[in-house]
Swiss-Prot record:
UniProt source species: Geobacter metallireducens (strain ATCC 53774 / DSM 7210 / GS-15)
Catalytic activity entry: a lipid A disaccharide + ATP = a lipid IVA + ADP + H(+)
GO biological process terms, semicolon-separated: lipid A biosynthetic process; lipopolysaccharide core region biosynthetic process
EC number: 2.7.1.130
Protein name: Tetraacyldisaccharide 4'-kinase
């Protein structure tokens, strides 16, 4: 009974929220709110729901596709969770990474580290961050990370990611559901990419919008810091403790087990969690209790371990990549922008 009352209250609260975000989108569409435009093409990657749909590996995939076409690529990120959040800074010029994850947030630092040659800037004002990149880095094209709701910046290609198993969550907007906007916002997308697909046909919520399917692939492990990529078989015969501070840690742990990694224990932290004394203590206690030989985590978590890494013993980072099952729609959409 109590659960129903709570859900009913959340549903009531969802109404003004949905109305507010819908009116905001309409105001931008009608020109009441000004949309600013950079003088380079902008490709936005975002989603309708909160939580993990694979934005970071998708940004990396799009960046690699663009770079394979000879383009200089810069990612514009908010810098969420970093001490410099709200300020405009260059994270990487494609050769060097200037800021730590503690300063710039885990996602831009992870992307700049994982994709050689990728430039990255941060700023709450993504237009100002883009102007800084144009002046200092001279990119050919921008990728706007988590940009579907950042309507203030014009984009030439609007890529929307949707989880294959639950593309609209429970169909309700925050706080009763997972949707950041009402489902009508889907119409702003130029391309829908269904993520976490396992081979089955994707749902058909995209209507006439071009779509493709993608799956998450663990491509191996790297011994920290800076080790070469190895297959998961390098871990066979040993027991590990997996940990993650991401939106869906359980999916990460399940993927490791599917790769044959013997996990003696798992430890979940909050999304974008910084690693300090409390987190180190939890990890070391879990490792001792389980009698594990190593720790293993995500690439996004790995970039935050620098100050504490030497205290954790043997630590591996799993390499997560996005694999397209039908790449043609994405490649066609990108080529139209260039």
């Amino acid at each position: 009974m109590l659960d129903r009352l709570v859900l009913a209250l959340l549903a009531v609260l969802s109404v003004p929220y949905a109305l507010a975000v819908r009116l905001r989108a309409l105001a931008y569409g009608a020109g009441i709110f000004r949309v600013k435009q950079l003088n380079r093409p902008v490709i936005s990657v975002g989603n309708l729901t909160v939580g993990g749909t694979g934005k970071t590996p998708m940004v990396a995939l799009v960046a690699r596709l663009l770079m394979a076409r000879g383009k200089r690529v810069a990612v514009i990120s908010r810098g969420y969770g970093g001490s410099l959040e709200g300020k405009t800074h260059i994270v990487s010029d494609g050769q060097r990474v200037f800021l730590s994850a503690a300063e710039a947030g885990d996602e831009p630092v992870h992307l700049a580290t994982a994709v050689p040659g990728l430039m990255a800037v941060i700023g709450t004002d993504r237009y100002a961050a883009g102007l800084l990149a144009q002046e200092r880095l001279n990119p050919d094209v921008f990728i706007l990370d988590d940009g579907f709701q950042h309507l203030r910046l014009h984009r030439d290609l609007n890529i929307l990611l949707m989880d294959c198993s639950a593309p609209l969550g429970n169909g309700m907007v925050l706080p009763a559901g997972l949707l950041r906007e009402p489902p009508l916002a889907l119409k702003r997308a130029d391309l829908v990419v269904y993520t976490r697909c396992t081979g089955a046909e994707a749902p058909a919520v995209h209507g006439a919008i071009p779509s493709c399917r993608a799956g998450h692939v663990l491509a191996g492990v790297e011994l920290l810091p800076g080790g070469e990529r190895q297959p998961f078989t390098a871990l066979y015969g040993r027991r590990g403790v997996a940990f993650a501070g991401i939106a869906d840690p359980d999916a990460f742990f399940a993927s490791l087990r599917e790769e044959g990694v013997d996990l003696a224990a798992t430890v979940s932290f909050g999304d974008h969690c910084p690693y300090g004394e409390e987190e180190v203590a939890r990890l070391m206690a879990a490792r001792r209790t389980a009698g594990a030989d190593f720790l293993i985590t995500t690439g996004k978590d790995a970039v935050k371990l620098g100050p504490v890494l030497s205290r954790l013993g043997i630590v591996y980072a799993a390499v997560l990549e996005m694999s397209l099952m039908d790449p043609k729609p994405l490649e066609t959409a990108i080529d139209k922008v260039l």
